[in-house]
C-alpha cells in the first residue's frame, strides 16, 4: 500500500469488528449493481438455465465482486483515510485491520472462482478471475494512482458482470455480451467524472490523479459531454440488436435525451456558478447516471421477459 500517513487510533485498535464491518468491506452497493447486471446478462442469453444453477452462479459472481471490493479497501486504506467520502470505511475507521481485509478478499476470491467453475463453466470462472485481478491489481494498484485515465481503462472491471452472466448461460461469448459490456464501460467515465467535479478536493488531498486534478474541471466537463454523446449512440444502437426491442429502444431514447441534457448543462457551467450553488447540477447528473444504468439494463431484462410471449425483441 502507498503510504500517505494512514494510521488507526489506539481506541480504534481496541474495537472488536462486527459482522456488518466485514460485510461493508465487500462494497454492498457496488455488489448490487454487479448482481443486477450479471442477472440481466444471464436472462438475456438465448439459452435457459436451471433456476438453482442460475441462482448459485449469480451468488458466486456476487461473492467474487465482494472479494475484489475487500482487496481494493485493503490496498486503498491509506487514501481512504484522507478522503472525506471514504474516511468512515472499516479499515481507516479502525473497525477492521488491513490484514483481515486482505485475508477475506483472497479467501472469497478463491472460493467464488472455484465454485463458479464447478457450478457453471470454466470460461465464466476465468472471466470472474480476470475481473477480480483487473479491479484489485490493474485498477487499484496501478491505474488509480498513476494516470488520469484510471476510470476510463479501469471501467472494464465493472463492465464484465453481464458478460459473465451471458457466459454462465451459453458457455461462449457473443456480440450481445460485448454490447452490454460496452454500455457499462462507456457509462463509467461520465459517472465518475461528475463525482470528481464536486469531490475534487478529496482527490487533491489523497494525491489521486483524477482528470479534475490533472487537467482541471473545465476539461473534465468537456470530456463528460464527449463520452456522453458516444454513450448515447451506443445505447440507442443497442436497441436494434438481438437484446434490444421496442421497449428498450423507447427507454433508451428517453434516458439518453435526459442524460445528454444533463451533460450539456454541466458543459455550459462556469466554475463560479457551480461553487455558488455547491455543484447542484453536477450532483444531479451523478444521481441521474445511477438510474440511467439501472434503467437500461432493466429494459434489456424486460425485453427478455417478454420474448417468450412473442412481445419482446424485433
From Swiss-Prot:
Further remark: Carbon 2 of the heme B porphyrin ring is defined according to the Fischer nomenclature.
Molecular-function annotations in GO: protoheme IX farnesyltransferase activity
The name this protein goes by in its record: Protoheme IX farnesyltransferase
Keyword field: Cell inner membrane, Cell membrane, Heme biosynthesis, Membrane, Transferase, Transmembrane, Transmembrane helix
PROSITE patterns reported in the protein's UniProt record: UBIA
Listed GO biological process terms: heme O biosynthetic process
Domain of life: Bacteria
Stated role: Converts heme B (protoheme IX) to heme O by substitution of the vinyl group on carbon 2 of heme B porphyrin ring with a hydroxyethyl farnesyl side group.
The protein's enzyme class: transferase
EC number of the protein: 2.5.1.141
Membrane-topology descriptor: Multi-pass membrane protein
Recorded coiled-coil stretches: none
Quaternary assembly: Interacts with CtaA.
GO cellular component, one term: plasma membrane
Cell location: Cell inner membrane
Entry-linked Pfam families: UbiA
Catalyzed reaction equations: heme b + (2E,6E)-farnesyl diphosphate + H2O = Fe(II)-heme o + diphosphate
Source organism phylogeny: Bacteria, Pseudomonadati, Pseudomonadota, Alphaproteobacteria, Rhodobacterales
Residues passing through the membrane, by range: 30-50, 51-71, 122-142, 151-171, 178-198, 224-244, 247-267, 285-305
Pathway, per record: Porphyrin-containing compound metabolism; heme O biosynthesis; heme O from protoheme: step 1/1
Gene for this chain: ctaB
Ion transport listed as a keyword: no
Entry's family note: Belongs to the UbiA prenyltransferase family. Protoheme IX farnesyltransferase subfamily.
Entry annotated with the keyword Signal: no
